Every structure is written in structure tokens, then in C-alpha cells.
Amino acid sequence: MNQTFDFQDEYDIIVVGAGHSGCEAALATARLGCHTLLLTLNLDKIAWQPCNPAVGGPAKSQLTHEVDALGGEIGKMADRTYLQKRILNSSRGPAVWALRAQTDKREYATIMRNIVENQENLRVRESMVTDLVLGDNEEIIGVETYFGVAFKCKAVILTTGTFLGGVIWVGNKSMPAGRAGEFSAIGLSETLNKLGFETGRLKTGTPARVDKRSVDYTDLEAQPGDEKVRWFTFDPEVWVEREQMCCYLTRTTPETHKLIRDNLHLSPVYGGWVDAKGPRYCPSIEDKIVRFADKHSHQIFIEPEGRDIPELYIQGFSTGLPEKLQLQMLQSLPGLENCLMLRPAYAVEYDYLPATQCYPTLMTKKIEGLFCAGQINGTTGYEEAAAQGLVAGINAVKFVKNEEMIIFPREQSYIGTLIDDLCTKDLREPYRMLTSRSEYRLILRSDNADQRLTPLGREIGLIDDRRWELFESKQANINSEKSRLNSTRIKELDEVAINIVADTHTKIKGSITLADLLRRPGFHYVDLEKYNLGNLDLKLVEKEGAEIDIKYSGYLQRQQNQIDQISRQKNRRLPTNLDYLSISTLSLEAREKLSKVQPLTIGQASRIGGVNPADINALLVYLEVQYRQFQLTSANV
């Protein structure tokens, strides 16, 4: 708030919170030349994975690839510390392929701490921020900590995770904490409220951890990693294969369900002590039993937390029920009849700022120089947090240098889709990225994230010469191979063509290009290699890149045409001083929603909940009338 302060140190940018969002933000700002301070409540928990120690999965893997393509860190971290890797949805098309890595949580945190502590231009310090220092024009000029130390800066990025007003619950017992064993951040929520920000409460939770030595694996279904290891990062320097560990699958039983149903009144939510919304797509086991009452069993995955850690993560079994009941629930699962519980499950509720209070740059609308990223914006997940942290970091640097900030269009990346959803939709539950949230998922694949975003990363300054040369070489090889496949023909009487017809039971009339062979259902690049028609000099990712571009070329072009058509109108900018409440042709709900969100473009306005196509049409007509009146007035002057 506005006071006179004796600042201890001065920085360009201060990042509050050193989770996955804060680390990406701080590394980006420091690497782009800004003197940065990263403040955290606990130096030993930098980039900690308090819930599932895993990176990736549907839509989340695309986010991770995109962060890496721009020059971020989370993809490299997952590749450096993986315990197991699997491709999910491999039987379906490439638009929904998803790489998932189980990671070593202690190793992950140790390596990330080492990276941030040794990054040029970045200083890391343990402290709790309780206040924002504003200048005469209500702009950010610094922060103040709980113990009264003030630091001067030009921009602040809040990446506070679940720590703002955090309270953890086990049954009807609660304590102030951002997560188990760590106190919550106090004071900052009150500061934000005084500044006019709306805050709300959200809830999440984490399952119990059990001792791996107490589990009977005899009848559990093994879930091994993939033989062929895939990578999140596009940087081959990080591609070092490691020994993989096995995960296991068990299921809930009628006994499990009865225990939960009989004791629902003891859970924080069903008991009425917590009314904050939890994540729809990562429900507690109580929610599953209630919402899917007709299901007699639910899958439960048993996953290692590290190579040298005895703890197992019981995925799909998060709960807020009392601790003594939790052990009975665990021991009702096959294989866990004699398990030892090392840490109880708990629910955590915390403050967040609905992200409609941010521009798509992630700078807040009320305070210049204040950015928000991660769970404070209402998201859930390390990958969503990392993506926002990177964007906030990039734009904080742009702000400090007085350069135009970057907005990521939703049709160019999952990052853009994520931020556009956050800034335009009135979300009241934790937001998780899903492939279904993108209208353009055929184009927004993991394999082409570098093609879509690395040129931007280079322009921003986060992609160095070595990475850029690797990128250019890969793209040149893919384009060259596509040309070869489109121009190389085999004739129906050639020996290789006769063999292909015999094996595939599909005729070749006259001749056919290798590209058209690839377009056939069930025919892949590995089949070309089987008939010595492939290019032995190419890397796997280059072969796959060429195959996907050719096999799906028709669909890709159709989607690109849709994007081009929409973008012609949707990028039309809206006046920042537009009084939506006075536009009588808009529905009342649209007036209220548009006035609250203050969208920057027609496209953004069209995606706000409660704004329908008729409202957009009315808005376009209104703008056209205003424009003509302006021209008429100007002509008469």
C-alpha cells in the first residue's frame, strides 16, 4: 500500500513463491536480463511436488512441450528426474497422444533449487510477503515482508500456490497451512482485498502415502514404463535414459465403498465445514462414490515417489476423511491389506483471484506491474502453473523494458487456450487443461510445439544459438523428407510394390507416391522402412513429423482454413473505454459480463460465458455505427 519505505535492496522484478510457476517466471526474467528476486516460504521446498510427483498426461504434456519450445524448464526437469515414462492414448491419433512421466520428487526439487540458485541475475531468499508497495499512480514499486523488510522493484509476479490463507483439513480437524508441514501465507490476501481485488476460495487434496515395503504386489496389475523412451524437451542434451520403476494397479472394493458411505458426514465437504469448490477432474474418493454411485469399483494406481524414498503415492484415493478411518480404507484395497500409512491424506482450501481480473498478458487490470500466475489464478496442476509462470515472466520483462507485451492466441497453443479461458470465463472451480478445451487440437500437437513456438522463443530471447540450430536442422530435415516422399513413386509392377500389395491387400494402380502410401490407413513410416523406402539418416522425431504432416494434411489444412477465417474477425480490437452497460442491443447478461471482463478483442468477447453469437453480432453492429458516426463528425469539422 502507499507508504514511505526504507528499501533494503532494489530489483527489476520480484517473484513471490518458488513452486513450478514461480521457478519458470524467475528463470525467464533472469535469463532475459532482469535483476530478479525469488522469495519463498521455504528454501528446501523449491519446485516441490506436494501431490502426484508426475508431469504430463492428456493436454498437460502438450503444455509441457510448449513451455520447453519457448525456452522453459519443466520439460527438462521431467526428463532429468523420471522414474517411469508412458505414452497415453497411443492407439488414437497424434492430436491426443500424451507423454506422462512419474518423477522423483526429491531429486526434482534438489535439481531445480540448484538451477535457480546458480542462475545469473537471480537471487533466491526465504521470506513471506505480506504487502505490496504502490507508487503515487497506484503502480507497483516494491513489496514488504512479514518481518518488515521492504524490497524495491518495477514489477511483481504472484505465484503463491495454495498458500494464500491456506487451511488443511483431515476430517473436522483443521490448521492453517499451505500444505502439510508448512505454514500458510498471511496478510497478502487482505492486502489484495483492500486494493479492490475479488478473492474466492478453492479446494484441492492429496492422498495418503504408504510404505512400499508393506504392500503385497503378488496380485496387483503391473504398469511398466514404455520400452521406447520419449522426451518432453526438444533438447537432445537432456536425453539420458534411466532405469525405470514399475507402477501398479488395484481397485476399490465393496468394503471400501461402504466405509466411505457410512462416514461421509465426517468429511470436511459433506460434513459442511468446507464449501470451497474442488477440482472436477481430480475428485476425492468420497466424491467418486457419491457422484458415480452405480460404479462398483474404481481404479487406484500405486506409484513410487522416488528411487530412495519408501513412500508410495496412492493415485485416485485423495480424501479429507479422518486419519484413523483412512487406514481402514487403505487396507480394504487388494494388495494393501497390511499396509503402513506414512502420511495421511488431507484436503486444503486456499484463496485465489478469479483471473478475469487479469489481462491475457497475466498483468492485473487494477495494478500496473502486478502479475499473477499459477494456482492463484484458479488453476490446478504443475504444468498449468509452469506455463503461466513463463508467460508472466516474459511479460513482466516486457513491462519493465517498456516493450509491447505478448498475448498468446488460443489457436496457436494450449498455453494460449489456457490463458484465454482463465481471463474470459468466470471460473468458480479449479481449472485443469483438457484436450477438449481446444478447438484446434489437431494443429496443437506435442510433436510440433517447437515448430509453433520456438521461433517466438528465439525472438523473445530464451532460445540460444545451439537450440536454434537444432530447431532449424530438424525443420529442414522434415521439409526435405516431405518433398522426397511426395516426389518418389513406385510402379505397380516394381517388386517392392508387388510385396506391398501382397502384405496390405490394397491395390496400386499404375504408380503411387510414398506420400500417398503413408496416407493409407494403417500404413506408417516404419512400413516404408520395412520395404527399404525410408530415410536412414533421419531421427525418429523427424520421421514422425514428416509422416504426421503428410498423413493428416487434408485435416490440417481444413483446420488451418477455419483458423484463418475466424482470425480475420476475431482479432478486431475493442476500445478499452467501451461502456458496455449503455449498449441497449446487448442482453443484460452480456452487458454485465463484458463490463466485468473488459475483453481486448471480438474473439475474446465471443468466448465469455453468457455472451452469445447474437450479442457479438449486436456488438459488431454497434461498433460499425460508432465508427461511421465518428467519420461523419470528423468530415464536418
Curated annotation (Swiss-Prot):
Recorded GO MF terms: flavin adenine dinucleotide binding
Any single GO BP term: tRNA wobble uridine modification
Record flagged with keyword Lyase: no
Keywords: Cytoplasm, FAD, Flavoprotein, NAD, tRNA processing
Entry-linked SUPFAM superfamilies: FAD/NAD(P)-binding domain (SSF51905)
Disulfide linkage: none
Binding site for FAD: G17, A18, G19, H20, S21, G22
Binding, NAD(+): 278-292
Coiled coil: none
Co-factor(s): FAD
Top-rank taxon, per record: Bacteria
Any single GO CC term annotated in Swiss-Prot or TrEMBL for this entry: cytoplasm
Chief site of localization: cytoplasm
Cellular compartment(s): Cytoplasm
InterPro entries according to UniProt: FAD/NAD-bd_sf (IPR036188), GIDA_C_N (IPR049312), MnmG (IPR004416), MnmG-rel (IPR002218), MnmG-rel_CS (IPR020595), MnmG_C (IPR026904), MnmG_C_subdom (IPR047001), MnmG_C_subdom_sf (IPR044920)
Family label: Belongs to the MnmG family.
Subunit details: Homodimer. Heterotetramer of two MnmE and two MnmG subunits.
Function: NAD-binding protein involved in the addition of a carboxymethylaminomethyl (cmnm) group at the wobble position (U34) of certain tRNAs, forming tRNA-cmnm(5)s(2)U34.
PANTHER family cross-referenced by the UniProt entry: GLUCOSE INHIBITED DIVISION PROTEIN A (PTHR11806), PROTEIN MTO1 HOMOLOG, MITOCHONDRIAL (PTHR11806:SF0)
Protein name according to UniProt: tRNA uridine 5-carboxymethylaminomethyl modification enzyme MnmG
